[in-house]
Every structure is written in structure tokens, then in C-alpha cells.
Amino acid sequence: MKKYKTYQIVVIIIGLFLCFFGRFIPVSPKSMILRSAFTSRRYSGLSASGAQTLFIMVGGLLMWLLVGVDWTSLAVILALALIPELGMNKVAAGTLGNSTVFYLLLCFMLAKSLQATGVAHRLAVWFLTGSFSRKGAWCTIAMIFVSIFVLSSGLSSSSTIMIFLPILYEIFESLGYEKGKGDIFPAVMIASLAIICQIAQATTPISHAMTLIGFSSYNSYTGNNLEFGQYVMVAMPVGILTAIGWFLVCRYVWRPDVSRLSRLDYDAIKGNEGPFSKQEKIAATIYLIVVVLWLAPGISKYLCPPAYPLLNKIHQCYPPIVAIILLHFIKVDGKPVLPYKEAISAVPFSTLLFMGALLELGTALANGDIGVSTWLGDTIGVFCTGVSPFMFIVVLAAMSVILTNFMSNSVTCAICMAIAMPLSTSLYSGLISPVIAAIMITIGINFAFATAPATPPVAIAADSGWISAGRLFKYGAVAGLVGIAVMLAVGLPIANMVC
């Protein structure tokens, strides 16, 4: 049984009380919340169910942030089901029955094919040991960054970091570095592994739970879909330029001593890998076809408008379903390329349940009958009067990046969306497109680089023994500033063109 610290027990008690009994808390009229929730009458525009939804959000975020995302997700789901306007049937359909949750499940299963067949590891080694990488120390570092970026854009950042950690450890040891010595080069590389992973995670929704939460939160508030291709056209340039910016910071600001890389044995890293196996070719080909089908609808809207109506009928779940079935039935040497049981074993169901709970919470906040969205727009709008649309986007972008470095991506997304969506459809209606605000937030919440609580890859880097917490925070903070600058200088203009 998991043992909780004293503060966590206190948080659990407070969180559960807010989730289930928050509506009975008498609140001063000055706070614009219900004095009593024994009745369903409105007070200052907020219903009893609206007040309860806000308390569920506060209680849920507290438990998710300080306790964990396991059983707490079930508690939030139950609390939401007790709201009269929702009920268990709607809540169940909105959590595990959510198409975005199902899509993420399929992504994890499909991504397993790249890991199980060895494609992911081979790709990483190929980048690292190629002819360009051998031209010099900074060429090697550049190719390491490129390989991390490429893999993490299609795999979860946690999977990518687990592929590269053994490779980096092998490099450090072969060059004579030791843990705890405070050498800058290993520290820069370990920090960069987490940073590039997170940057790439922001570029596509493929196997990226937090990016998909941004997609679904936008849908919950507006009823519209954020297109795959539309998002990638904005996020990919931002990600690439942010990664390049970080590389330049590493080379010209941190300036680690890279002289030892001249002794790196590339052939030893490459090992005895033979040519591409038939399984690898099949898995890689099918995966690439799926990615093309995901991108086709959004891109065709701009490059080939006549084809858009047809391609737009391809739901994002269709390609991976077909791919997973094919990989199960296509056999090489009498064995499936990816057996179904092996594919399903790659699915982190606790993550899916957490994601479903968070999405349903967003749906409840946006529910017109409950009225929280309207109330938030009116309440927060008072503080935004006189703030220009551009400055509002600047604040959103900065807030999403800053908050996500001190709390989980999902909590940051919930907070930022709860502020941005109501205001972009009320105070800034016609001035700020909700989809642009959603894209900026979704990119920003992935730029979690500075602290261990921010995201699992950063926690792994912090616990590696190759970098101190202080240095990781400094590197992550600078990377965050680079990300904000690129989001506003490049991402925002592109978003205004394609959205």
C-alpha cells in the first residue's frame, strides 16, 4: 500500500471535501459565489452546480498536483457524475468514451511497433553515427538533438528519454566522465535530452497526452475541432526554431568543453546492427502511412482544397486502427510484426483515466446549463478591461510556460483554458480567435523544462546524477524564455495566417 506524507493526507481530506461537499460551504457575497448550495437558485450568475464544478476543479487540481493521478481521477469522475446536469452516463461517455482518449490509446499501441521491432533505437543510432555526426564535436551534438527531436515528435517523451539515456550514459563513460563531478558537458546533454523531448512533444499530438488535452479542452469549450494539420503547421516551426535556439544557447552561452568528443568511438556505439529487418521495414512503412493520413486533411485544406472534403472524412482514429490490425496479422517468420497483446501492454491506462477525468472536467466548465464559463468570463473580464488582444496572448503564452515549469502540464492547461476560452468568446470576441489561444496554450504547457515536478522526463533528468537541481533550473528557465520568444515571434504570426 502506498504511504502518504502528512501534507498529502491533509490535501486528500481537503480535496475530497471540496469535490463532494464544496456546495455546502457558505461563502461571503463579496466573493460572487453562492452563500448556500442547498438550493439551486443563481447568485451573481453562478448556479449551485456551477459552484460545485469550481470546487471539483480546485479539489481535483490540488490532489493531482500534490498526491498523484491514480485513484484521484476516479474521485473526480464520481464527483462530476453527482452533478445533476451531468450524471454518470454522460460522465462515463466523456471520460473513457471520449474519442481523444481512444485516439491516445491507439497511438500508444501503434508506437509500440517502433520500439518492439527496434526501429526507434536504430533511428537514434543512425543519426548519432552518420557521416555528418563524425565531422566534429558540435556536429555530433547537433545530430543527437535532431534524433531526439525526431523520435519524440512521434513517441511519448518518456519513451524517447528511456531510449537515449543508455546511449548518453555510454558516451559519458567512454569519455571518462564521472557522476557528481559537476562537469558541464554531461549536465548540458542530460538537460538537453529532457528539453528537446518536451519541445518535440509540443509539435504533434501523436502519442502526446498533454497536447491532446489541449485539443480536447478547446473542443469542450467551443464545440469545434482543432485540426491535426492546422496545429502542426503552427507548432512544428515553433518547435524546430526553439530547438535550434536552444542549440545555439548551448554552444555560445553555456560553452561546455567538448574536446573529449574527439575520442568518441562511433563504431562501438553502432555495435553489430545489421541491415533493416523485414519487421522493421513493415513497421516503419505502416507508421509513416498513418502519419501522412493524419496530416493530409489539414494540409490539403491549404494545398489542395478540392481534395479536402474527401480527406476530411478520415477520422484520426481510422488509420491507427487499421494499422494495428495489419501489424497483428502480417507475419514474418511465422510471428506477427506486432502481436495485439504486446501492443495493448504499452497502454498506460492510469494516464488515460486521468486524461478522461480532466477532459470531462473541462466539458463541465464549458457546459452552458452549468454556467461556469460565462461566470468566469464576466468575473475575470473585469481585470482584463483595457488589455489589448496582443498583450492578452502574450500573457497567456508566458503564463502557460511559467506555470507548467512548477506544476503539471495538465493542471496548467486546465487553468489557462479556463481563463482564455471564456474571454476569447466574450470580451475578446472577434478580436482573438479561440483556436489561436488554444494553440498557444497547448504549445506552452509542453515547454516544461526547469523543475522535476514539471514533467516525467525532467524528473528523470534531475534524478540521473549528472546535473544538479540548480543547474537544471537555470538551463530550463533559459530554454523557457527561448520558447516564449519563438511562440510570439513566429508561432503567433503563423497562427494568424492559417487559423
Write out the residue ranges for each language-model feature.
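Hydrophobic transmembrane alpha-helices of multi-pass small-molecule transporters
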Residues: 1-103, 230-378, 478-484, 489-499
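Membrane-embedded alpha-helical segments and adjacent helix-loop junctions characteristic
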Residues: 42, 72-78, 82-179, 344-345, ...
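C-terminal ends of transmembrane helices
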Residues: 59-66, 116-130, 329-340, 398-402, ...
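Transmembrane alpha-helix interface/packing and boundary motifs in multi-pass membrane proteins
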Residues: 60-69, 147-157, 195-205, 329, ...
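Juxtamembrane helix-boundary/capping and inter-helix hinge elements in multi-pass membrane proteins
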Residues: 83-86, 116-120, 129-134, 171-186, ...
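Alpha-helical transmembrane segments of multi-pass membrane proteins
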Residues: 104, 137-150, 177-200, 226-234, ...
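Transmembrane-helix bundle segments that line or gate the permeation/cavity pathway
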Residues: 158-173, 177, 183-219, 234-264
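Transmembrane alpha-helical segments and their short flanking loops
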Residues: 209-231, 261-265, 456-478, 490-499
